[in-house]
Amino acid sequence: MHGRKIAVPWGIFGSGNIGDEAMLQGFAELVKRDTEQPIRVWVASRNPAHVSRVVPSFKYFRSKGTVGSVHRWAMRYADAYLIVGDTPVMDYLGPWPLTDIEKIVKNAKARKKRIACLGVGTEHLSGERSVRRLTERIAPVVEHWTVRTENDKVRLAHYGVDQRRVTVAADLGWLVPPVDTSFGMRWLDHLERRGDTPLIGVNLTHDRWSLDLLPELPSLIARVLDSMINRSGAHVMLFANEVREGQGFDSTGIQEVLTRANRADHMFAIPNRYWRPQEAMSFVACCSVTLTMRYHFAIFSALQGVPFVSLSRLGKLKDLCTDLGWSHELSLEDANSSDVESLLGRALESRDHLSAALRQKRQAMVRRAGLNVRSLDRVLD
């Protein structure tokens, strides 16, 4: 028996965001649970060599935003298509990614392939053209949506998606099991980090959107970390969860903070490598608390039971904190150094209690993430 064939044609994986591969690992766990018959999965990727090391159970074809011969072959012979993970419904960066999704959906319709969205997020759409693209060309064709939060379902309803086609699940990253600290500790020992003081893990972005909301972002983070070091003797681990280089990415934000900090002697940056999710999570597990602007760095913290403070630039981080009943969150546009420092200080002081609460909540989120199987089942029934 050759089994059923799924194409995952939206080629976000391998782009440089460690969270993407966490979602792909979660998807692989869902596929593995289906024991009726084998499922073969072909995944579009910007970096097949890296992604195949992270999730070796799938087949990969290179995608750079265009449809090549292998891409066309996979889409022709697959039984169904899935849009897996990330946030395909958004337009704050412009027409992408909805333009990609529209092309995939159009292809599915032309080839009479079933298509669903699995484990996806949404944001408010600001452009009328984006709204029409979703309501008129995408929503009528997509057979089912499993989404991260109730707010995602509300947004889809606002854009005319039939609510019977939507299941509230959770991010696929919740299906990645926690790890121990051994990998992270080996690196921290190599970097000569003292083990007898609190360790604050920091992940920040440096994209245009964030700087428009808070132009003094690097200076604010530097002031907060200086104060936390003076107050508690903490060390600071700066980590890029998005490893691409350039003005808009995490590594630039890290350097901007280090340049502005007075206590850079207590700060160190983890080498900017394309770490596997388990390696990133091991670094997080070594931390006392974390400060994050990225969605999956927050999930990594929650998975590891490490209290985090969220600087939310978009709806998905706010939605995550709401789901977790988590009050250590600030909107980026409203953030000031006093409030950020206060939240970090409270998280550090109450970390044992908060860690236990996160571990308890993790169990519920893992169960919810399992509901993503409904989109898989829908296209294969």
Q: What are the language-model segments listed below?
A:
Residues 1-381:
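Active-site anion-handling motifs in enzyme catalytic cores
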